[in-house]
């Protein structure tokens, strides 16, 4: 008989509300200091996250499906077998409008060129962050197999 699968609650929230709430067996995140994989009974943590993809491996009953979520930074807290991700913004791969993300990427690239030409450090940093967010959304959309 197979061992019972150990699942924990995974929640992703933004200022606009809850984006995701399911049970998973593994959550992969990119903290600002590197990759992290969280499993059932992981030690409690609170760590800042980079603009990146969050992967949630669902239960065997769900075919061990992996849910892909684009986040624009934030924090993950894990305690008592609940992973809570609080992000500035988050989007499930299935909800990403890739044409909007591509347009945002092009706008950010234009703003980046203009900021470099004008030696405008403040707008350069903003454009770099906007470009990372757009590229992350496109990458997460493509990771889902589109």
Swiss-Prot record:
Induction: By low pH. It holds the Pfam family ATP-synt_DE_N. The keyword Ion transport applies. Its main location: membrane. Belongs to the ATPase epsilon chain family. Produces ATP from ADP in the presence of a proton gradient across the membrane. This is ATP synthase epsilon chain. It comes from Lactobacillus acidophilus (strain ATCC 700396 / NCK56 / N2 / NCFM). The lineage of its organism: Bacteria, Bacillati, Bacillota, Bacilli, Lactobacillales. The gene is atpC.
